[in-house]
């Protein structure tokens, strides 16, 4: 990890995110929803790739032309971006889109882990209701405040999403009532996922494991 990234992301936070992600990628590989790789720093960005490393060994051009996907955490001065990179089988070019901005690396990590955990819950070998739908039905925790995005917030998104009118209408800032400095900036369709702001990693793990078969839970030992 380069020095600039180390200044922005404390090592203990890196270790915590990697530890919980390792738990969930192990579950993904167990249920056949993987393979998911270990987190990997590349040019100051943390990649959480799926269907990548083994095929890269078999075909060196897989990085450029393969159909792998990845969540990417990018530390920027003052905030943390989470993007999704994907190349569909029939598309010529890979797409990458910024999805959420957080004030905290840990919250960015929880977002990525929630996405992986929900993909496991809804995969064909598990078939549970997604946490997203559960949270959507219940509504956000009262400890999370929802506000219209500021001009500065909108500026972050239109730099990469290039749709100011849409952002002005749909972009929101979600912050903890008791800790306004802990926030996420996202389009309103992401609102249920902003519940992660109010959860610890252990609480998120318990929510994702809820209802899973014993064949999975018996192999899980969160530390």
Label the model's feature ranges.
Residues 42-72, 84-105, 109-118:
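Hydrophobic alpha-helical segments that drive targeting, anchoring, or assembly
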């Amino acid at each position: 990890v380069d020095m600039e990234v180390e200044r922005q992301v404390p090592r203990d936070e890196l270790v915590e995110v990697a530890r919980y992600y390792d738990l969930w990628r192990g579950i993904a590989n167990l249920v056949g929803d993987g393979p998911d790789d270990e987190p990997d720093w590349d040019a100051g960005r943390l990649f959480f790739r799926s269907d990548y490393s083994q095929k890269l060994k078999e075909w060196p051009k897989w990085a450029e032309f393969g159909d792998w996907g990845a969540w990417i955490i990018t530390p920027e001065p003052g905030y943390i971006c989470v993007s999704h990179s994907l190349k569909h089988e029939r598309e010529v070019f890979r797409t990458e889109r910024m999805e959420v901005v957080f004030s905290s690396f840990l919250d960015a990590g929880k977002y990525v882990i929630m996405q992986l955990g929900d993909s496991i819950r809804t995969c064909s070998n598990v078939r549970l209701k997604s946490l997203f739908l559960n949270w959507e039905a219940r509504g956000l925790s009262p400890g999370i405040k929802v506000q219209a995005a500021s001009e500065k917030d909108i500026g972050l998104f239109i730099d990469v999403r290039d749709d100011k009118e849409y952002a002005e209408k749909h972009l929101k800032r979600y912050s903890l009532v008791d800790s306004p400095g802990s926030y996420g900036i996202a389009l309103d369709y992401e609102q249920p996922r902003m519940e992660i702001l109010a959860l610890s990693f252990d609480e998120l793990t318990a929510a994702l494991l809820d209802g899973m078969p014993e064949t999975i839970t018996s192999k899980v030992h969160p530390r």
